[in-house]
Amino acid sequence: MEELQGYLEIDGFRQHHFLYPLLLQEYIYALAHDHGLNGSILSEHMENLSHDNKSSSLIVKRLITRMHQQNHFIISVNDSNQKGFVGHNKNFHSQKISEGFAVIVEIPFSLQLVSSLEEKEIAKFHNSRSIHSIFPFFEDKLSHLNHVSDILIPYPIHLEILVQTLRCWIQDAPSLHLLRFFLHEYWNSNSLITPKKSISFFSKENQRLFLFLYNSHVYECESVFIFLRKQSSHLRSTSFGSFLERTHFYGKIEHLVVVLGNDFPKTLWLFKDPFVHYVRYQGKSILASRGTQFLIKKWKYHLVNFWQCHFYLWSQPDRIHLNQLCNHSFYFLGYLSSVQLNSSVVRSQMLENAFLMDTAIKKFETIVPIIPLIGSLAKAKFCNGSGHPISKPFRTDLSDSEIINRFGRICKNLSHYHSGSSKKQSLYRIKFILRLSCARTLSRKHKSTVRAFLKRLGSELLEEFLTEEEQVLSLLFPRTPSHRPHRERIWYLDIICINDLANHE
């Protein structure tokens, strides 16, 4: 970030926010390439990209020269006779420019966030990026709340909504026109946003740009929570957003209070409960409150109206589910979570009188949902739809050890992620499916029976599926036979993404 600020110490940029000329600077594409190698969570496959000739500085210089010489920057894509900027090697040039454009549009947000963090002296904790860090928060807060709302964030039904979202931040009209060009180009070719899904699907060639657009859209959807939180609580609350791809946003709190305060002056009395907690991951969020059913219904009503009025889109009311925590389990981040009432009888004796008191204690429970996991395994061809293990097709040139290592790595990843489950019987079933699928795969390769193969390789195959979690539990509870390790939860604060089973190869 210090390096980026050094490039941008220009009075004209700070005063007029002219981002468009930066596309003609070579260092922008170097920054985009560096971010793709080091800063991207979703681009792990780009480790060897530095040896790719497409990323050489010579090609970037030729691209910038072509942009300088082009009379009309954007020409008709349908005109095959022209060989201008887009017509010649259109896909590659669009990809490189969109990567540089993604770095440029992040500049206003990044600089404002850095200055905000320096003023407030807010420390950065990398562990807060972990997905598992959400669940200790649930354990601490949800047991004291009454109602929970499952919310699917509405998707933009028109591309212009994404452009209008950035108009308040970016005042450079040519940059916004270029953004429209990229959106319409990829809408026609890749179907950037589909109405059947609740979140955006990003083109593999332009993940950074589309992830930035989706995060900006989600930030606008969540802006109402900042305002209502400030109005409903007597405590001063500060907020800032830190998103993936090192894309940072600084909350427009003051402007938001002025706008929404004029539009909703008579509804603020409905939000007096300070115990409201909001958590989001990707396109799904959880809103929990200690208030009454009436209050939580009002939250739903005003959220739907806010999204309809502010984004000019129809947000279906059935995308927000309201339930009581004690009677409902909600699915979030691969876990089926709920708050259970555990009754305990306590015997109290005072002098000659004895009393039996039955107390109910709320406890946060996390369960591994077996049906969705079996569905994922079936999709990846480890088992059929009913969970019966089948042989997985692999390349014939793979050795037995490579096949066993791949199965073992998938099993360890699942065990590592679902280590926070309070009931691990379902997880043991998943391990059994993977182990037997591995045995069927190897027996098919050697044209043998599963029984004969397991008898010959049983102990070695079993060792590959021992997880780090079981080793940690043996260290934590070595001499406590009363503890049941299969009920102990362990949250790892180094998990920042969910691995797709289908991409294990």
UniProtKB/Swiss-Prot annotation:
Cellular localisation: Plastid, Chloroplast
Alphabetical list of InterPro entries matching this protein: Domain_X (IPR024937), Maturase_MatK (IPR002866), Maturase_MatK_N (IPR024942)
GO cellular component: chloroplast
One Pfam short name: MatK_N
The keyword Plastid is annotated on this UniProt entry: yes
Keyword line: Chloroplast, mRNA processing, Plastid, RNA-binding, tRNA processing
GO-annotated molecular function: RNA binding
Coiled coil start-end: none
Domain of life: Eukaryota
UniProt GO BP: mRNA processing; RNA splicing; tRNA processing
Family, similarity comment: Belongs to the intron maturase 2 family. MatK subfamily.
Function: Usually encoded in the trnK tRNA gene intron. Probably assists in splicing its own and other chloroplast group II introns.
Protein name stated in the entry: Maturase K
